[in-house]
Regions:
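Catalytic core of DAGKc-family lipid kinases
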Residues: 89-169
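A residue-level signal for conserved active-site and pocket-lining positions in enzyme catalytic cores
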Residues: 9, 59, 63, 85, ...
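ATP/NTP phosphate-donor binding region
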Residues: 1-57, 61, 98-113, 124-135
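ATP/nucleoside-binding phosphotransfer catalytic cores, i.e., glycine-rich phosphate-binding loops
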Residues: 143, 159-162, 209-291
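Gly/Ser/Thr-rich active-site loops/lids in small-molecule metabolic enzymes
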Residues: 165-209
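Short glycine-rich anion-binding loops that position phosphate/pyrophosphate groups of nucleotides
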Residues: 11, 64-66, 89, 177-179
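Short glycine/serine/threonine-rich phosphate/pyrophosphate-binding segments
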Residues: 15-16, 65-70, 180-185
Length: 291
């Protein structure tokens, strides 16, 4: 039996129907189901809840944000994630809802591959050097201003060496997986998702002399704001974070625990870029996006 943990987004109207189809399908594929606690209102009060260490694969029903949340729930156990897209973009997910049955049949038959995606370890150190917050990021870690239209002046170091002083609205520290997220919007490079690098991209830099950097995965990056608005924030994968103060330090390095994402081999990263992000301007005809 394959132990399948289900993570879903209650905001999608089609979720109850997808869950009903999943529960009908599970016995035929020898799948045992458990659900995150928030899904019990649609999966049923008797639905078993996901227990850490007791699932073989996480099935996400939603969009990219749902997959990012599942990666955080995984807590570094390296459980493969199979993403079913119920949303609009679905860049990280594997396939749309109408292909869920085929995807699960192939997974049950062992007809799949796993891509191990690099993640980032992010820590906030207070003015005394004490660790006060800690996360793992699949996409990115962003230090940015809050509600005031005032730039942040910050010093960036890599492996103890000064890189530059940045004057910008913020800074994005991204993985290759996250290179097509906020990093891309901020003018950063697209990096093939299975590579291992740390991307440093300023947000609306107040100079023409600063450009994005691609660092070795072994780099330890320190960001120390020197001046700026009182309201600073650190945001991780666009979902969690904390306030941040002048005198504190953001430390980002490669995490030792990657996130395994299930793929089925059809299509390519570049086909997905063309189909989802309109890379190159015109999509190719009869093209299969990455799955």
């Amino acid at each position: 039996m394959i132990r399948l943990g289900v993570v879903g987004h209650l905001g999608y109207g089609g979720l109850p129907g997808v869950l009903a189809a999943l529960r009908r399908l599970a016995p035929t594929l020898e799948l045992t189901l458990s659900f995150e606690d928030s899904l019990r209102e649609v999966a049923g009060p008797d639905a078993p809840v996901i227990e850490p260490g007791k699932v073989d694969v996480l099935l996400t029903l939603g969009g990219d944000g749902t997959l990012l949340r599942a990666a955080r729930l995984d807590a570094g156990q390296e459980v493969p994630i199979l993403g079913i897209n119920l949303g609009r973009l679905g860049f990280l997910t594997c396939c749309p809802a109408d292909m869920m049955e085929e995807a699960l049949r192939r997974f049950a038959a062992g007809d799949y591959t796993v891509e191990k995606r690099m993640t980032l370890d992010a820590r906030v150190l207070d003015a005394g050097g004490r660790d006060r917050a800690h996360w793992r990021a699949l996409n990115d870690v962003v230090l940015h201003k809050g509600g005031f239209a005032r730039v942040v002046t910050m010093r960036v170091q890599a492996n103890g060496e000064s890189v530059a002083r940045y004057s910008a609205d913020g800074i994005v520290l991204a993985t290759p997986t996250g290179s097509t997220a906020y990093n891309l919007s901020a003018g950063g490079p697209v990096v093939f998702p299975t590579l291992e690098t740390i991307i440093v991209t300023p947000v609306s830099a107040h100079t023409l002399a600063l450009r994005p950097l691609v660092l070795a995965p072994s780099a330890e990056v320190l960001v120390q704001p020197e001046d700026g608005p009182e309201e600073l924030l650190v945001t991780v994968d666009g979902q969690v974070g904390t306030t941040f103060a002048i005198g504190e330090t953001l430390v980002v390095r490669r995490s030792q625990t990657p996130v395994p994402i299930v793929r089925f081999g059809e299509g390519s990263f570049f086909a997905t870029m063309r189909e989802k992000l309109h890379w190159g301007g015109l999509p190719e005809r009869d093209e299969t996006p990455r799955c």
